[in-house]
C-alpha cells in the first residue's frame, strides 16, 4: 500500500491571499546541503528533499510506492495547483474515463476536455550513473514549488506532474559512493582521473540494479521491484505524456525525439504525431539557450519495453531525453571543453520545462488526441485478429499465470472461459493457420477491442515485422561492417518467451467467459498421502528446484529421464520423484509446502511399478539427485548482464543459493567445494587468461576432469573451448568459412530440435524456441553422437526451421542444425555448453528448465 505524506491543513487551500511560494518552501540546497551540480544527489537526500517540500507546500503530495532491492525508497512527487489537489481523486477518476472512452458520451468528453488537467510523468536516471536526469527533475520540482511566474502558474493549473526523480536508487548510490570517495576539493575534469574512471564491471554496476539488470528493458515483464512499483502508478494515473531522462556518451550534447527508424506497425500514431510538436518545443528551448541538440538519430522505439516505448504503447507520448554525460561532476569533451554536471542538469531542466509549457498550453488538444487514439485502438480491435487465447492446458501453469498477470498489471482486460469454446480462423503462436480449434473452459481470452489494443498486439502477435526500408539500410551497414542499429532484440512474443501455447483468432463471436479481476495462481489439485512416492509434474520448471529443496530437508529425490505410466496416469519426462516409503511421516506436509511455494501439481502413488514397458520408479532411467553446491564466476572479465540474469534466476525466481567466485580466485579457491560452476558470458578469453592466469584456468580444467560440472553461457563457452575441454567447433573455424562475413542474429526466437533421449531435455516444453542474439555458430563434433559427446538441443533444420524476429539470409543458411545446448563428458566430470544466454533478462522463462537441468541435475546425471 502506498505510504502517503499529506502535508497541509485544508484551511491553507482557501487562503484568499497566500504567501509567495518562495517564502514557504525550502530550496534544494537548504535541504540537501549542496547546490545542484556540486555533488551527486543520493537517494536519501532525494527522500529528505521530497518530504521537506511536501511538508511546506500545498502544491505537492509525496508517495512512497515501494523499495529497491537494497531497501532504498522509491518515491515520487505529485505536483499541481492547490485547487487541483483538492479534487485529486476526481482528476484521477477522470483520467481513467479518458483512458477508456467506452461509454464516455460526447457531452462528458467535452466537459472533461474543458476541466481535466493533463497528466505528465517524469522518470529520472533509470541508469544509475546517468546523473543529470535526477538532478534536472529535482530542479524542476524546486521551480514548481518556489516560483510564481506565469508559466509556472499555468503548468500548475493545467497539469498534474508526477516527478519520479530516481528510478534506480541502488545503481545511482553505488556510483555516488565511487565518485565521492575519489573527488578532491574541486571536481577534476580529467577523463583519466580516478573519480571519472572505472572498469567495465563497475560501469554496469553503476548503470544497473542490484542484480545487474538494465531496468530500462524490463517494462513489459516487470521482473524487478523497481518496475513493479512504477507500473501501477502509470495505470492509476493514465498519463498523456511522459519523459525518460537519460545520458549518453560525451561526444554529443543532447538528443530529443522524434526517434529514428524502425517504428513497429502497432506503434500509436498519437505518440508519433506529438513527437513532432514536443520536438519543436524542445528545439525552441534549446535555441534560446544556445544548446546543441539532435533528433531522429540513434534511438528507436521498436522494442516495446523501454520506458519510452512502454509509455507510448500504454497510450502516452513517451519521450526520450539523452544528455551528453559529465561522467561524475565534470568531464573533458573531445574538443577540450569541459562539461559539468551543472551543465548537464540544466539541459535536462530546459527540455523538461519546454515539455511542461507545451503540455500546459496545449492541454485540450493533447486530451482530445489522447481520447481519439484510444477510440481508434478499440476500433482496430474490432477487425482482423479479434482475440488472443492462452489455453488452460497450454504449458507450465506457473508460466501461464505469469503471462496473464503481467498483462493485467499493464491494464489489459483478461477473461476466462466458463465453458468450452470453438473458434474459427485460429492461428498458433508461430503464425501458422490451424483453422478451427476448441479451447477448454478455464482458458484465458484477451479481446483486442479494448484500450490497450496496441500493447496487446505488440506483445501477443507471433511477429512484429521490421519495416523493409530500415532493413535495406541496415543491410548496407552490415555489408560495410558497421552496426546495423537494431538497438535491441526483434522477437518478444510472450507465448514464445514463456514457453507456453498461444493462439489468435479472427472470430469475434460472443463467448461464455468471466473477467479476471485479481492476479491468478495455478490451480493445485489436492493429492492423497502416498505410500511409495510423490510425483511432481514434469512440465513445470519449478519442479526441479522443488526437488533440491526437499533433498536439503533429507528426502530421497530423483528425476525421470523419460515418461512413464503408473496407476493409470501418465507422467512426463522430467517428472520429479520424492520417495516416501522410508521417509519421515512429515514427508507429505513438506511436499505440500513446497508445492504451495512453487504452485506445483503433485500426485501421490502407492507403487513404483509402471505399466507395460514404461520405466518404473526404481529403474536405471531414474536420475537420483544430490544437493549440488553451485558457484558462479564474477567480476572482470565476466559480462555483468549475463551474470545478473543467472544470479536473479537462481536467487529470486527459484530461491537457490549460489557462491560468487571472483575470476582471479580461480588460482587459490578450493574448487572441490562446488559441484557446479557457472561461467556467464565473458568479454574474451584473453582477458580471462590474464585475470585468472594460466594456473587458474588449469585448476578449473582439473576440477572438471575430477568430477565437476561446468555450465557455460553464450560466449562463456569459449572458455571451455580455449581449455580444450570440449570438441565443439565454431562454424567460422572451418577453413572454407574463415573469410565469411560474421552476421549477428538480432534477438530472434528460433525453432529447435530436442534430443528426447538426452537427460538435458527432460521437462523442456515441446516447441522450445532458442532466443538467439549473437553471431555464434557452434557445430557438434564430426561423426555420430556418442554418450560422451551429445547435443541435447540443436536448431531445427529443413522444413522445421522457423523463427520469429529478424534474421539475415546468411544466418538462415548457417543456423539450421547448429548446436544450442551441448554436453561433453570430460574425465569424471562434464561441460554443459549453451550457445546463447539461456537466462536472457530473466523473462526468457521458456529456457528455465534447460538451465536448471544443467545446473542442478548435471552433477547427478549419467
Question: Which residues does each predicted region cover?
Answer:
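Bacterial N-terminal signal peptides that target proteins for export
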Residues: 1-9
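Bacterial N-terminal signal peptides
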Residues: 8-18
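Sec/Tat signal peptide C-region and signal peptidase I cleavage site
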Residues: 19-23
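Intrinsic-disorder/low-complexity accessory segments
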Residues: 24-131, 138-162, 211, 217-218, ...
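Carboxylate/His-rich catalytic cores and anion/metal-binding grooves
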Residues: 141, 158-180
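Short, solvent-exposed turn/loop segments enriched in Gly/Ser/Thr/Pro and often Arg
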Residues: 165-169, 179, 245-252, 715-716
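Active-site cavity-forming subdomains of large catalytic enzyme subunits
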Residues: 177-200, 220, 224-227, 239, ...
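Aromatic- and acidic-residue-enriched carbohydrate-binding clefts of CAZyme catalytic domains
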Residues: 193-213
Amino acid at each position: 500500500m502506498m505510504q502517503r505524506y499529506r502535508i497541509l491543513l485544508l484551511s491553507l487551500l482557501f487562503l484568499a491571499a497566500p504567501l509567495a511560494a518562495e517564502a514557504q518552501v525550502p530550496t534544494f540546497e537548504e535541504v540537501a546541503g549542496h547546490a545542484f551540480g556540486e555533488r551527486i544527489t543520493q537517494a536519501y537526500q532525494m527522500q529528505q528533499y521530497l518530504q521537506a517540500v511536501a511538508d511546506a507546500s500545498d502544491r505537492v503530495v509525496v508517495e512512497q510506492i515501494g523499495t529497491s532491492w537494497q531497501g532504498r525508497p522509491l518515491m515520487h512527487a505529485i505536483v499541481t495547483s492547490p485547487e487541483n489537489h483538492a479534487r485529486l481523486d476526481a482528476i484521477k477518476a477522470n483520467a481513467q474515463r479518458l483512458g477508456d472512452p467506452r461509454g464516455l458520451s460526447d457531452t462528458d468528453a467535452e466537459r472533461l476536455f474543458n476541466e481535466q488537467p493533463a497528466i505528465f510523468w517524469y522518470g529520472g536516471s533509470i541508469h544509475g550513473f546517468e546523473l543529470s536526469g535526477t538532478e534536472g527533475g529535482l530542479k524542476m520540482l524546486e521551480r514548481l514549488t518556489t516560483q510564481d511566474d506565469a508559466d509556472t502558474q499555468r503548468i500548475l493549473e493545467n497539469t498534474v506532474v508526477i516527478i519520479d526523480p530516481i528510478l534506480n536508487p541502488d545503481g545511482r548510490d553505488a556510483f555516488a559512493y565511487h565518485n565521492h570517495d575519489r573527488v578532491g576539493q574541486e571536481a577534476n575534469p580529467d577523463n583519466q582521473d580516478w573519480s571519472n574512471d572505472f572498469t567495465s564491471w563497475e560501469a554496469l554496476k553503476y548503470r544497473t540494479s542490484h542484480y545487474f539488470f538494465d531496468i530500462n528493458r524490463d517494462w513489459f515483464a516487470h521482473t524487478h521491484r523497481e518496475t513493479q512499483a512504477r507500473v501501477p502508478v502509470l495505470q492509476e494515473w493514465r498519463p498523456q505524456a511522459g519523459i525518460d531522462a537519460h545520458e549518453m556518451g560525451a561526444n554529443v550534447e543532447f538528443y530529443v525525439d522524434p526517434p529514428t527508424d524502425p517504428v513497429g506497425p502497432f506503434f500509436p500514431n498519437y505518440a508519433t504525431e506529438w513527437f513532432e510538436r514536443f520536438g519543436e518545443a524542445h528545439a525552441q528551448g534549446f535555441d534560446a539557450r544556445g544548446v546543441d541538440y539532435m533528433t531522429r538519430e540513434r534511438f528507436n522505439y521498436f522494442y516495446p519495453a523501454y520506458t519510452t516505448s512502454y509509455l507510448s504503447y500504454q497510450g502516452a507520448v513517451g519521450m526520450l531525453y539523452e544528455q551528453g554525460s559529465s561522467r561524475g561532476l565534470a568531464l573533458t569533451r573531445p574538443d577540450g571543453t569541459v562539461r559539468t554536471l551543472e551543465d548537464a542538469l540544466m539541459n535536462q531542466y530546459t527540455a523538461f520545462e519546454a515539455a511542461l509549457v507545451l503540455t500546459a498550453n496545449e492541454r485540450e488538444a493533447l486530451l482530445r488526441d489522447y481520447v481519439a487514439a484510444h477510440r481508434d485502438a478499440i476500433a482496430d480491435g474490432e477487425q482482423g485478429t479479434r482475440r488472443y487465447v492462452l489455453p488452460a492446458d497450454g504449458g507450465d501453469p506457473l508460466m501461464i499465470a505469469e503471462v496473464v498477470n503481467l498483462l493485467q498489471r499493464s491494464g489489459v482486460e483478461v477473461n476466462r472461459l466458463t465453458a468450452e469454446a470453438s473458434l474459427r480462423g485460429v492461428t498458433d503462436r508461430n503464425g501458422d493457420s490451424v483453422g478451427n480449434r476448441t479451447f477448454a473452459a478455464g482458458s484465458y481470452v484477451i479481446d483486442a477491442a479494448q484500450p490497450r489494443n496496441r500493447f496487446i498486439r505488440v506483445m501477443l502477435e507471433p511477429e512484429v515485422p521490421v519495416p523493409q526500408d530500415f532493413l535495406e539500410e541496415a543491410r548496407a551497414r552490415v555489408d560495410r561492417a558497421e552496426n546495423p542499429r537494431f538497438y535491441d532484440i526483434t522477437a518478444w512474443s510472450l507465448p514464445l518467451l514463456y514457453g507456453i501455447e498461444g493462439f489468435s483468432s479472427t472470430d469475434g463471436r460472443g463467448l461464455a467467459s468471466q473477467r479476471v479481476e485479481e492476479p491468478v495462481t495455478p490451480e493445485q489439485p489436492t493429492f492423497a498421502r502416498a505410500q511409495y512416492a510423490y510425483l511432481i509434474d514434469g512440465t513445470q520448471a519449478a519442479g526441479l528446484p522443488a526437488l533440491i529443496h526437499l533433498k536439503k530437508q533429507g528426502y530421497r529425490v530423483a528425476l525421470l529421464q523419460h515418461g512413464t505410466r503408473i496407476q493409470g496416469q501418465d507422467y512426463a519426462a522430467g517428472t520429479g520423484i520424492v520417495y516416501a516409503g522410508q521417509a519421515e511421516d512429515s514427508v507429505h506436509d513438506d511436499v505440500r509446502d513446497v508445492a504451495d511455494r512453487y504452485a506445483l501439481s503433485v500426485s501421490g502413488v502407492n507403487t513404483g511399478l509402471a505399466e507395460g514397458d514404461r520405466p518404473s520408479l526404481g529403474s536405471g532411467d531414474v536420475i537420483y539427485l544430490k544437493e549440488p553446491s553451485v558457484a558462479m564466476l564474477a567480476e572482470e572479465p565476466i559480462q555483468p548482464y549475463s551474470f545478473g540474469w543467472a544470479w536473479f534466476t537462481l536467487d529470486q525466481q527459484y530461491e537457490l543459493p549460489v557462491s560468487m567466485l571472483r575470476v582471479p580466485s580461480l588460482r587459490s579457491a578450493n574448487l572441490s567445494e562446488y559441484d557446479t560452476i557457472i561461467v556467464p558470458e565473458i568479454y574474451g578469453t584473453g582477458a580471462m587468461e590474464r585475470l585468472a592466469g594460466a594456473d587458474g584456468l588449469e585448476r578449473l580444467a582439473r576440477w572438471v576432469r575430477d568430477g565437476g560440472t561446468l555450465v557455460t553461457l553464450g560466449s562463456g563457452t569459449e572458455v571451455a573451448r580455449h581449455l580444450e575441454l570440449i570438441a565443439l567447433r565454431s562454424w567460422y573455424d572451418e577453413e572454407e568459412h574463415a573469410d565469411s562475413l560474421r552476421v549477428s542474429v538480432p534477438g530472434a526466437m528460433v525453432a529447435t530440435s530436442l534430443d528426447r533421449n538426452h537427460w538435458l531435455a527432460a521437462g523442456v516444453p515441446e516447441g522450445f524456441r532458442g532466443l538467439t542474439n549473437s553471431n555464434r555458430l557452434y557445430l557438434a563434433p564430426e561423426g555420430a553422437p556418442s554418450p560422451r559427446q551429445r547435443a541435447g538441443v540443436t536448431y531445427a533444420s529443413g522444413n522445421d526451421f522457423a523463427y520469429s524476429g529478424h534474421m539475415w539470409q546468411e544466418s538462415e543458411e548457417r543456423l539450421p542444425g547448429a548446436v544450442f545446448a551441448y554436453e561433453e563428458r570430460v574425465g569424471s566430470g562434464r561441460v554443459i555448453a549453451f550457445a546463447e544466454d539461456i537466462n536472457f533478462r530473466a523473462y526468457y522463462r521458456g529456457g528455465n528448465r534447460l538451465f536448471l537441468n544443467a545446473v542442478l541435475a548435471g552433477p547427478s546425471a549419467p
